[in-house]
C-alpha cells in the first residue's frame, strides 16, 4: 500500500533484512520518544524534480551482508548481492540463484542446484561460494538461528549444494534469503556479488552502476548515485532535504521523529510478530479456557489502525496473514459474556476478584499504548489488569526470571512460521512455562508440510493458546512524492521486482 504524506514519523531502526528467531533488540535512545502526528494525504501528487536517484550509505563501512551495520548498508547491498531464494509479498520463496531444489520424503536432506551465475569480476558462482557464505551466516547473530537445525552442509559438485537438517522442514528454502558473496572477498569493504549493480567510484563520487555480468532482466536505471552519511540520523536529515531518495524504516520503532515534505510511503509486511505472553504459573492464566477467552476478546484491528497508524496486520495465529495459506477460518471472537464466564469457571468473580500486571518495555511509546489498550480490553468487574513499564534491561530480566503475569512481546519469526522457540518446553523464548508435547508435535508436523498438518496445528494452537498473537508489523519504504511508480518492496528485498519500477527523473523517464 502506498500513501502520499505531508509528514511521517521516521525512526532509527532502518533494517529491512533479518527474519530470524530473536527477542526484540535492546532499544536505542538516540532520539526522543514521541508518538507521530496524524498522517495527512496531499490533494495532488507532486513532481519529483530529481535528476539522480540517490541512496545513502555509510562510507568506510563494509557492505558484507553478514557483518554490515543494520540499515542503509543492507539496503544498498540488496542491489549488489543475490540470495538463493527471495521472499515475495506472500512470504513464498522465489528462486534467484537456485535453479531447482528438492528434498527427501522426510524433508531432512535438501539438494540445491545453482543457476549459472557470474560474479561482477567475471568468475562463476560455485557451490563453494554459497557454502562459505552459509557457514559464516550460521555463526552470525543476524542469520545464525536459521541454521540452528542444520546438521551438515557440503558442496556435492561445483553447482550443487546439499544441506542435511536435524529436524524436518518442508519450508527450508524460505530461510535461505541470505545474500551470497564471492568466497575470499568477504573481508574487503565491498565484497563481490552477482547482483544487478556494482559499486564504483569516480570524480563525481560513489555510485552503483549496472553490472555487465548480470544475467537478469533489464534495469530501470543504469546508474544510482550514492551519498555518504555518518549515521542513520544523518540519512534521515539528507532524506528530508531530498539529497537522498529512498529509506527503509520501522515506523513504530523506539523513538519517532517527524520529517516534513511531500513523501510517499509504501508499507511492507514483515514477519515481526507482537504477542501477549502468559505466565502459566499464575492463576487464572494456568486455565486454558481463560487464555483462549482472553485471546478472543482482544480487538486487534483497533490496535493496528488506531495505535500503530495502520502499520501492521492483525493476526490471531502465529502466521503472517499475507501468507497464501493463512488459516483465517480458525480465527475466533469471544464475547464479554463468554470471557466473564471463563473467568468465573476459573474462580475469578466479583466476590473473588484478582489483579494481574502486564509488562512492557518503557522505551517504546507505541508498545506502551498497545499495552494500555490491552489492559482496558482485558479488565472486567472481576479482573483488573494494569500496565507495569520497565526499562529494557529490567524488562528482559523479569521475563527470564518469570517475574510477570502477562507481557507484551515481539519476535521476528522465520518465514516457515516455526513457533517452537515460544511454545516448546525449554524454548529460548518460552518465558511462561508452557509445555505440550502434543502441540510441539503438531508444530513439527506443520513444518514438514501439508495442508492437513497445517490445519491440525492451528486448531491445536487455538485450543491451547500458549501465547496470543496480536499483529504482524509492517515496515515502510519512503520516497519523495512523484519519483517512482510500481514499487513492490518486500521484507526480504526492498527492491523486489526492480525491473518493473518506473522512475520519473527530471529531464528523463525510465
Explain the meaning of each model-derived region.
Residues 56-105, 135, 192:
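N-terminal lobe/hinge region of extracytoplasmic solute-binding protein
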Residues 154, 200-207, 225-282, 410:
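Extracellular/periplasmic solute-recognition and catalytic clefts
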Residues 165-225, 231-234:
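Gly/Pro-rich hinge or "lid" segments in bacterial periplasmic/extracellular proteins
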Residues 281-323, 458-466:
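Periplasmic-binding protein-like
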Residues 296, 312-346, 364-367:
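Structural transition elements
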Residues 346-413:
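Ligand/substrate-recognition segments at binding pockets and active sites
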Residues 386, 391-395, 420-483, 507-510:
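Extracytoplasmic/peripheral linker and loop segments enriched in polar/acidic and small residues
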Residues 480-510:
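Long beta-strand-rich cores associated with HINT superfamily self-processing modules
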Amino acid at each position: 500500500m502506498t500513501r502520499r504524506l505531508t509528514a511521517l514519523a521516521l525512526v532509527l531502526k532502518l533494517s529491512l533484512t533479518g527474519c530470524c528467531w530473536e527477542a526484540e533488540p535492546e532499544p536505542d535512545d538516540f532520539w526522543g520518544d514521541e508518538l507521530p502526528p496524524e498522517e495527512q494525504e496531499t490533494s495532488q501528487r507532486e513532481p519529483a524534480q530529481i535528476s539522480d536517484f540517490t541512496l545513502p550509505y555509510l562510507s568506510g563501512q563494509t557492505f558484507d551482508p553478514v557483518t554490515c551495520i543494520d540499515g542503509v548498508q543492507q539496503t544498498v547491498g540488496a542491489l549488489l548481492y543475490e540470495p538463493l531464494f527471495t521472499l515475495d509479498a506472500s512470504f513464498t520463496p522465489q528462486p534467484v540463484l537456485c535453479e531447482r531444489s528438492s528434498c527427501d520424503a522426510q524433508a531432512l536432506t535438501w539438494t540445491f542446484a545453482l543457476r549459472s551465475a557470474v560474479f561482477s569480476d567475471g568468475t562463476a558462482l560455485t557451490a563453494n561460494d554459497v557454502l562459505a557464505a552459509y557457514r559464516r551466516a550460521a555463526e552470525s547473530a543476524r542469520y545464525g538461528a536459521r541454521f540452528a537445525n542444520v546438521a551438515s552442509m557440503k558442496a556435492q559438485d561445483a553447482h550443487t549444494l546439499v544441506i542435511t537438517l536435524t529436524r524436518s522442514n518442508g519450508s527450508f528454502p524460505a530461510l535461505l534469503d541470505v545474500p551470497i558473496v564471492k568466497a575470499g572477498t568477504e573481508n574487503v569493504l565491498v565484497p563481490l556479488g552477482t547482483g544487478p549493480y556494482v559499486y564504483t567510484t569516480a570524480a563525481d563520487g560513489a555510485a552503483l552502476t549496472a553490472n555487465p555480468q548480470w544475467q537478469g532482466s533489464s534495469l530501470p536505471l543504469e546508474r544510482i548515485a550514492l551519498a555518504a552519511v555518518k549515521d542513520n540520523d544523518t540519512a534521515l536529515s539528507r532524506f528530508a532535504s531530498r539529497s537522498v531518495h529512498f529509506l527503509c524504516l520501522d515506523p513504530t520503532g523506539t523513538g519517532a521523529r517527524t520529517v516534513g515534505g511531500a513523501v510517499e510511503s509504501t508499507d511492507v509486511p514483515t514477519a515481526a510478530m507482537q504477542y501477549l505472553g502468559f505466565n502459566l504459573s499464575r492463576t487464572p492464566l494456568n486455565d486454558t479456557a481463560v487464555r483462549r477467552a482472553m485471546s478472543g476478546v482482544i480487538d486487534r484491528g483497533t490496535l493496528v489502525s488506531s495505535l500503530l497508524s495502520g502499520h501492521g496486520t492483525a493476526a490471531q495465529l502465529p502466521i503472517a496473514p499475507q501468507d497464501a495459506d493463512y488459516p483465517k477460518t480458525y480465527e475466533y471472537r469471544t464475547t464479554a459474556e463468554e470471557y466473564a464466564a471463563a473467568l468465573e469457571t476459573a474462580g475469578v468473580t466479583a466476590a473473588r476478584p484478582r489483579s494481574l500486571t502486564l509488562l512492557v518495555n518503557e522505551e517504546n511509546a507505541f508498545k506502551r499504548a498497545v499495552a494500555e489498550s490491552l489492559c482496558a480490553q482485558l479488565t472486567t468487574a472481576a479482573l483488573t489488569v494494569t500496565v507495569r513499564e520497565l526499562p529494557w534491561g529490567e524488562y528482559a530480566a523479569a521475563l527470564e526470571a518469570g517475574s510477570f503475569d502477562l507481557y507484551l512481546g515481539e519476535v521476528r519469526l522465520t518465514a516457515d512460521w516455526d513457533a517452537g522457540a515460544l511454545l516448546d518446553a525449554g524454548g529460548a523464548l518460552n518465558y511462561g512455562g508452557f509445555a505440550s508435547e502434543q502441540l510441539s508435535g503438531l508444530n513439527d508436523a506443520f513444518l514438514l508440510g501439508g495442508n492437513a498438518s497445517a490445519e491440525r496445528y492451528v486448531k491445536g494452537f487455538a485450543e491451547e493458546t500458549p501465547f496470543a498473537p496480536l499483529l504482524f508489523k509492517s515496515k515502510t519504504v519512503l520516497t519523495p512524492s512523484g519519483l517512482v511508480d510500481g514499487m513492490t518492496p518486500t521484507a526480504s528485498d526492498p527492491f523486489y521486482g526492480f525491473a518493473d519500477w518506473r522512475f520519473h527523473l527530471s529531464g528523463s523517464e525510465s
